[in-house]
Regions:
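Boundary/junction segments of secreted and surface-exposed precursor proteins
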Residues: 5-56
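Intrinsic disorder/low-complexity signature
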Residues: 15-18, 35, 127, 150, ...
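N-terminal targeting or signal-anchor segments and their processing/structural boundaries
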Residues: 6-15, 27, 54, 161, ...
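Extracellular beta-helix/beta-solenoid repeat scaffolds
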Residues: 57-202
Length: 229
C-alpha cells in the first residue's frame, strides 16, 4: 500500500508509568558493569570494512557484545547477528549508498540519554528481523530519500520516533528519484513501556512518521504490526 504525508490524529491519554512495576529496559537486562569486549566507533573501528577485515577474518557477519562509542559507518554489507550493542549518547549508525545493513536478533540500546539512530543514505538497504529490538533512539531508523527497508519481527521501544521517512525541512535542490520502499513490514511492535531515558514520564512522539514523500509499505497480506501506548 502507499502511505502519504501524515495527518493529525486525536490525542490519546498519556500512559501512566508505575515505577514499582515498570518492565526492565534493555540496558537493565543486558548491560553488565564494565566494558563489553568489542569497542566500535573508534579510529580503527569507524567503518564496517575495518571491522570485517581487521577483526572478523573477512566475514561480514559479526556476533558479539559491542560498546559503540562513536559513529559507525556501514560502508559495505554488514550483519550484526545476535549482538548486544550498548550505544553512547548522541552516537549514530550511518548506512552508505548501495550497501545493506542487517540486524538479525540483535539488541540496540543506550544507558544514558538517547542515541541518534540509524541513518539511511540514498539507495541504501536495512534489514531487521528475528526479534531484533531497538531502544532509546531519537529516530530509530531514518530515510530522508530513496532507501529499501525490510522490517520484520522487530520491536521499537522507548524511541522518540520509530521510523521517519522523508525530509523535515526545505525541499532538497535535487528531489529524490524514487520514494522509500518497505519490501517487508510485518510482525513488528512499536511501544513505549517505560519513560524515555533522562525523564520521569517522557513518552515516544510517533511510531512511523512521513514527511513530504510517498512510501510503499509491505503488502495487504502481511502479518499485522502492533502499535501500543
Amino acid at each position: 500500500m502507499i502511505s502519504k504525508a501524515q495527518t493529525e490524529c486525536q490525542e490519546s491519554t498519556p500512559p501512566k508509568f508505575d515505577p514499582e512495576h515498570e518492565p526492565r529496559t534493555l540496558c537493565q537486562k543486558y548491560s553488565p558493569p564494565g566494558k563489553f569486549p568489542n569497542r566500535f566507533g573508534k579510529t580503527e573501528t569507524h567503518f564496517a570494512s575495518q571491522i570485517i577485515w581487521n577483526l572478523n577474518n573477512g566475514s561480514d557477519v559479526f556476533t558479539g557484545d559491542i560498546d559503540l562509542v562513536g559513529e559507525l559507518i556501514i560502508d559495505q554489507d554488514f550483519t550484526l547477528l545476535n549482538c548486544k550493542v550498548r550505544i553512547s549518547p548522541n552516537v549514530r549508525i550511518r548506512v552508505e549508498a548501495d550497501v545493506t545493513f542487517t540486524l538479525d536478533g540483535s539488541k540496540l540500546f543506550c544507558c544514558q540519554d538517547m542515541w541518534q539512530g540509524i541513518d539511511l543514505d540514498y539507495r541504501s538497504t536495512v534489514i531487521s528481523r528475528n526479534i531484533t529490538e531497538i531502544e532509546d533512539a531519537m529516530v530509530a531508523m531514518e530515510s530522508p530519500c530513496t532507501a529499501t527497508m525490510s522490517i520484520r519481527n522487530t520491536t521499537f521501544n522507548r524511541n522518540i520516533v520509530g521510523i521517519r521517512l522523508g525530509y523535515d525541512g526545505p525541499v532538497p535542490w535535487h528531489p529524490c528519484p524514487t520514494f522509500p520502499v518497505f519490501t517487508q513490514f510485518a510482525g513488528n511492535t512499536f511501544q513505549c513501556n517505560a519513560p524515555l531515558n533522562g525523564t520521569t514520564n517522557g513518552v515516544s512522539f510517533v511510531d512511523v512518521q512521513v514527511y513530504k514523500t510517498n512510501a510503499t509499505i509491505g503488502a495487504l497480506t502481511s502479518a499485522f504490526n502492533t502499535f501500543r501506548n
